[in-house]
């Protein structure tokens, strides 16, 4: 085995499991309102029904901002409406969001390139720094794990110094389930018991065999081409297969593909599993896989397009095999693409959008999804329930009869349903204090599971003072992280610093540390940048 092959394999292993440069502050923006009061702004967040800790964090941050003479108001609203404002309309000042530790996010691509490159799919805050653009591109083509790690570490240091965003805390996945009804739950980094591996492995000890799974946000859509939200991915992966999966240990394992062979830095050979069928009985073929790649590239599938743009050619090489030629090496390909991408049935999607009455595939509701995954779609009562049943013909059939996703109006309502046995488990997070309470009840387990996600205060850097790195740094320095960690999160968190969490050990830059809340130092940073205060204590723009 050559040294290069060993390094490449080491890279794949490291990518599947889990060098700081000196930087200069970005140039001071030219303020149109020199020596005028800094205008009030708003912090947008999901309401308490979806996640009660976010508005609580927001209230503490708005109060803390008074210490630097700045007025902020809190806008807590429906989760899906807020997501739309940020990710479609870019109509926001600041935004508190929880970046969940989805399996594909073990790879640093999401938190480095997709969120911070000027053309990144998740860069809705308008950030554009040539140092980060360059590092984001370099880490994508660095096929040796240690070389890529150094680039990712350097990017984390720059992002922290530039305070492009403020990771607030690294929370545990706080979940609860009825252990007197469910067996064999499989927790996973970043997903807790809401993992795909729990979905297919959990057993039901009594009742009809269906697992009532609680969630506090309504499902937005079942379109695998348009999906960007974590909640959508968690439901779609039950219905649609992927070529590979990230297992509970963080290792990439074959799924719909029996093998994915990295021939060289720009060549990938894939062999599709024999005998797979779509839920309507048609055979799954390698032509479906090739169609899925081409189709999602044509329609600019938002989550997948950055990888698909690197696909120079996709060629069928046998009855069940294909070869991908890349235009350049693409390090995130395995975990960020193959472990996330949904295979589509060509015989259905080839006529969409024309026969669906929409002008764009991304607007297609897909209200009767047909996939090849371990669960078959039964019904979707929008805003209330989604029901899927076990696909007993699947190569990895579920051990339960199916899953019913129930939308509850609040965390309290979901916790009450678990307490009385009407709900079997949480899919996503439950308020930490409620987890502690449920853990005291016989037959219920409430616990926090390790995660590489984080709560984040994001800044729209196109707007007013948020364009100024010094101002953002001062904001980062007033966040009362200790109080948020100990009181709001009930201890189920660590203070936030870098955009890659400590739980993601290989990629986390441990030299990037959380800023301690200190209003005086924040004011000193502002003063050094030229900000002043009027007689009423209100913050004024620099000259």
State each model region's role.
Residues 60-64, 70-71, 88-97, 164, ...:
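Alpha-to-beta junction loops
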Residues 3-12, 23-26, 469-473:
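Twin-arginine (Tat) signal peptide motif
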Residues 180, 261, 306-354:
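Surface-exposed binding/hinge segments that line
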Residues 35-38, 85-91, 113-138, 171-211, ...:
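Short, solvent-exposed loop/beta-turn-alpha elements that line the ligand-binding surface or hinge
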Residues 11-38, 45, 52-63, 85-218, ...:
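Detector for C-terminal structural segments
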Residues 37-49, 72-73, 207-218, 267-270, ...:
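Short, well-ordered beta-strand elements
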Residues 258-302, 317, 323-325, 417, ...:
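Aromatic- and charge-enriched surface segment that lines or borders ligand/interaction sites
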Residues 71, 363-366, 390-437, 473:
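Ligand-site clamp/hinge motif
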